[in-house]
């Protein structure tokens, strides 16, 4: 008896037909599936994106996932930031948060503060601030904070937040913002003011960046990803006044910039936090399409399906995707300013493995972290998070291509095997000696594609090697580039954003380890210098006339203490793009 099943999935832009045939119930082994796709794949499933165009921060995924899991809808509160120049004793609100160094906490022989700001506050509080800070053993060390309910000021509470020896870097001011957010959450405060006890330590030139870092830290500190929990708390903080850092349109613009970047970071965090049974390659592609829809005045999207990737001869990328029941989706977002000339074309390429089992070289044993391999798309999350922020900021004079070869690395009879030889889209051949070194195989074709867009510079980001974690730990990413100029640009951007990068060598002699007897190269070169040989591999797929950098972010993509994604890379990428704009 013949069996025929026809199922259709429709979207606003296309219709998909999945037709299965079997000659009889007893010959299911001969069953095959025919896929009929339109020329451009727009939707693979019925999906409600993480971000709805009607609400800037709406997070719902409605999808028949394994486990029937759906993300709860979460609306993140909007915080109003403003710069003010007022007497701290006159500010009215819930918490007056004072950032203090260890030096600021010094007291005279009468146990009174020597710092002018603390002395003024203590005078209005009848000496209680000095007394209580001593009782609390608060000394201004980093990580220390205390919130006191003391009568005598316009604010309901006074918070002291330790800055350590000094506060002069963006990361220090971001930490101050995070501490402010923690205090606000604990007290359910709706209004907070932030002031430094010693603002003279901040130069006039750096006040804008410092205020921006405080704002960013506050937004990120308030964020909790509760989409997959049965209960969640909604932060009550509505407004933050930053005192002593200036005021006016220039500061307001910088604070708004920080807000846009922060929500891009949050988007990146949520993508990485999403489990692999929810965030498939199709859903990741839909998130990219939704960004293009949200910022349609400056952004367009092109999602390539498997057949289109075959036409482009992406044999390396498609080999990785071959074992998965979830088809690959090649994502290409393009940002173009709505007006004015384009002076620079950039490409941001992110590794997009929504799950990595390791393939036939399956991840086994302690430390393999297979349960965390949802974060193997951290590079793509950084790229799409940057796209979200750039869509909001709209920098003039620069065109940006956001590229992700999204897929899963699974195990099946159709999957790539150790020993297989793959042909990338630039014609180079690769002998697979480890199926768990798959990220570089997807990036190979993505880099070729990026260079073919006529860009001047390419930066790729990937959770690529454990070797980089061994070398640098989990607090910083390694950068690899032949270009000293590009290295300086990206490092400068990271310093302003507060993210840590360290330049690693591109030791060309190590390429000997990557040679194959049957192909142009192998995909791994052994344990020694593993992150360097990975970068040398990627270099083979970059045009000589394009400046290129690889960022290995395997370490800082995940915060094990918080058991959550960090959103690493977004802020640096946005800052780097902004530095190329004509604004």
From Swiss-Prot:
InterPro entries for this protein: Leucine_aapep/pepB, Macro_dom-like, Peptidase_M17_C, Peptidase_M17_leu_NH2_pept, Peptidase_M17_N
Keywords: Aminopeptidase, Chaperone, Chloroplast, Hydrolase, Manganese, Metal-binding, Plastid, Protease, Stress response, Transit peptide
Transit peptide: 1-70
Reaction equation(s) it catalyzes: Release of an N-terminal amino acid, Xaa-|-Yaa-, in which Xaa is preferably Leu, but may be other amino acids including Pro although not Arg or Lys, and Yaa may be Pro. Amino acid amides and methyl esters are also readily hydrolyzed, but rates on arylamides are exceedingly low; Release of N-terminal proline from a peptide
PROSITE patterns listed in its UniProt record: CYTOSOL_AP (PS00631)
CDD domains cross-referenced by the UniProt entry: Peptidase_M17
GO biological process, one term: leaf senescence
Annotated EC: 3.4.11.1, 3.4.11.5
Binding site for Mn(2+) 1: 351, 356, 376, 438
Entry annotated with the keyword Protease: yes
Keyword Plastid recorded: yes
Protein name: Leucine aminopeptidase 2, chloroplastic
Gene: LAP2
